[in-house]
Amino acid sequence: MITLLMLPFFLVLLAIFGIIYDLTTNKGRKECARTVSLFILNILTIGICLLDLPMESKPYSGTGFILFYALAYTPLIIVFSLYTLYRIGKHYRYFKSKFAITLLFNAILLFLLSLVNTFVLWRSFQMYHRNDMNLFYFILIVLGICSTIQLIVGELEMKRIRGIQKQEEQDGYEK
């Protein structure tokens, strides 16, 4: 039981070390539009939910999903959404475009939804209602949609930035 309770601390620590590594290796880069970690985390969580459906009539169905959701997904979504907000804020400082505005708005929405998710999880531990599971599903789906939008728009922004940088290189060679 103690090792199960240490899982969120280990995962958050691992995520923070990954973020620190990313920050130290990408110091000079200004383009930070694409975030894959939120998308992968949401796909993994939806996969675990589908493997262990809490709506089945078995006695302990959904326990694995609820434990993963409470102990791994919720702490990681806060860390990754905060890091995404930081990266997109840094990106927006250098590249102001419609894509960058969309990414910034979406990153703020992701962070606020992760805080709402934490509050709903805390409230469900205080007093459990059957509607809390439906709210978890709704938040998971909305976070999944937002992270997918973040991935797609971020990729489009990266292609736009690469085109701008390539054009600047060609202009530099001509001079």
Residue ranges of predicted features:
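Hydrophobic transmembrane alpha-helical segments in integral membrane proteins
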Residues: 1-16
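A generic, lipid-embedded transmembrane alpha helix
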Residues: 38-57
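Alpha-helical transmembrane segments of integral membrane proteins, especially early/N-terminal helices
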Residues: 2-4, 25-43, 104-109
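Hydrophobic alpha-helical transmembrane segments of integral membrane proteins
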Residues: 4-5, 71-75
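Interfacial non-cytosolic loop connecting adjacent transmembrane helices
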Residues: 1-2, 51-70, 94-95, 115-141
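Cytosolic juxtamembrane helix at the C-terminal end of the final transmembrane segment
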Residues: 20-33, 84-99, 124-125, 147-172
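Hydrophobic alpha-helical membrane segments
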Residues: 73-83, 101-125, 132, 139-149
